[in-house]
């Protein structure tokens, strides 16, 4: 549902931030 899409988007954003910090 919509909530799952929102959680997925938030997870992708968090992963991108983490990758940015590690690199």
Curated annotation (Swiss-Prot):
Any single GO CC term annotated in Swiss-Prot or TrEMBL for this entry = extracellular region
Where is the protein found, in the record's own terms?
A: Secreted
Q: What's the stated role of this polypeptide?
A: Antibacterial peptide, that adopts an alpha helical conformation which can disrupt bacterial membranes. Each caerin displays a different antimicrobial specificity.
Q: Which UniProt keywords apply?
A: Amphibian defense peptide, Antibiotic, Antimicrobial, Secreted
Q: What family is reported?
A: Belongs to the frog skin active peptide (FSAP) family. Caerin subfamily.
Please report the name of this protein according to its UniProt entry: Caerin-4.3
Give GO BP annotations, semicolon-separated: defense response to bacterium
Does this UniProt record's set of keywords contain Glycoprotein?
A: no
Q: Which organism is it from?
A: Ranoidea caerulea
Tissue and organ expression note: Expressed by the skin parotoid and/or rostral glands.
Claim: Oxidoreductase is one of the keywords in the record: no
